[in-house]
Swiss-Prot record:
It comes from Borrelia hermsii (strain HS1 / DAH). Part of the 50S ribosomal subunit. This is Large ribosomal subunit protein uL13. Belongs to the universal ribosomal protein uL13 family. This protein is one of the early assembly proteins of the 50S ribosomal subunit, although it is not seen to bind rRNA by itself. It is important during the early stages of 50S assembly. Gene3D superfamilies: Ribosomal protein L13 (3.90.1180.10). PANTHER family: LARGE RIBOSOMAL SUBUNIT PROTEIN UL13M, RIBOSOMAL PROTEIN L13. The keyword Manganese does not apply. GO terms for molecular function: mRNA binding; structural constituent of ribosome. InterPro entries: Ribosomal_uL13 (IPR005822), Ribosomal_uL13_bac-type (IPR005823), Ribosomal_uL13_CS (IPR023563), Ribosomal_uL13_sf (IPR036899). GO terms for biological process: negative regulation of translation; translation. Keywords: Ribonucleoprotein, Ribosomal protein. GO terms for cellular component: cytosolic large ribosomal subunit. The keyword RNA-binding does not apply.
Amino acid sequence: MNRITNNKTIWIKPKYVEKKWYVIDASDKVLGRIATEAVKILRGKHKPYYTPHQDLGDNVIIVNASKIRLTGKKYSQKIYYRHSRYPGGLYSDTFRTLSERKPTAPLEIAIKGMLPKGPLGRELFRNLKVFADSNHTLKAQNLYKLEAN
C-alpha cells in the first residue's frame, strides 16, 4: 500500500496568476543560452507553483535578435530546413542567409523547438515577442530587465 496519499496535482486558476513582462537583450549573447533562459520564463519554471500542464509562465520580449552570436562555424554551417508541402519542395537555408532575410527567425525557431509540442506549446509561444533591434512597441507594459549569460 502506498504510504504517501497526499500527492495531488496542483491546479491554479488563471485569475490568480500574475503575468509579468521580462525583457532580454540578446546582443552578443549565444543563441542557445538566450533561448533556454526565455523558455524557463515562458513555461513558468522560475515560479514555486510551476506545473507542466498549465500556462503559468510570464511574457518575454527579446530585443537585438539580429546581433545574436553562435559558437564555432555554425554561422555558415548550421542549416535550417523547411518544406512547401509540394513534391520536391524541400528548401534549406544557412544561418547566415536566414538571419539576413528574417533576423528574428533563428531565435524563434530555437525557442519553439524547446517548447512542448501541442496546444500548450502554441499558447506559450504566443507569449514571446522577438524584435530585431532595440525598438519595440511594448513600452507601456511594466517591464523587468532580465540579465542572461
